[in-house]
Amino acid sequence: MKMKNALIVNGGLNSTKRDQLGNYDLIVAVDSGTEQAYKLFLKPDLIIGDLDSIDEKTIKRAEKDEVQILKYETNKNETDFELALKHVLDEEIKDITIIGGEYGEIDHLFS
């Protein structure tokens, strides 16, 4: 079955409430966005990034939950968010919701 929509949960500040979100075919957590996802009672399908800002306890929980983890080198040309967005776009998903990363500066999302 082709996936129609995705949620990308970025790390950083997040003012989103669970009841503001719908149902998603794919939930992608970006590095420390995994912690945000779990706080919203969401189980990610995929964690993506260099995992430099996610604690070991959260990684162990994700492994127990059998979440797929795509770990990248810290020294890379793309941000973790860019890698997550590319992954979702490669799945040909057009309906994408992005939460988190509310630092106030959009340039923090892209390198």
Language-model region placement:
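N-terminal beta-strand-loop-alpha-helix module at the start
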Residues: 1-62
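Structured beta->alpha junctions
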Residues: 13, 51, 73-76, 102
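Alpha-helix C-cap/termination motif
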Residues: 40, 65, 90-91
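Glycine/charged-rich beta-loop-alpha catalytic/anionic-binding loops adjacent to active sites
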Residues: 63-72, 96
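Short phosphate-binding loop-to-helix
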Residues: 69-91
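N-terminal glycine-rich phosphate/adenylate-binding segment common to multiple enzyme folds
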Residues: 94-103
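Short Gly/Thr/Asp-enriched flexible loops that form oxyanion-binding sites at enzyme active sites
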Residues: 106-111
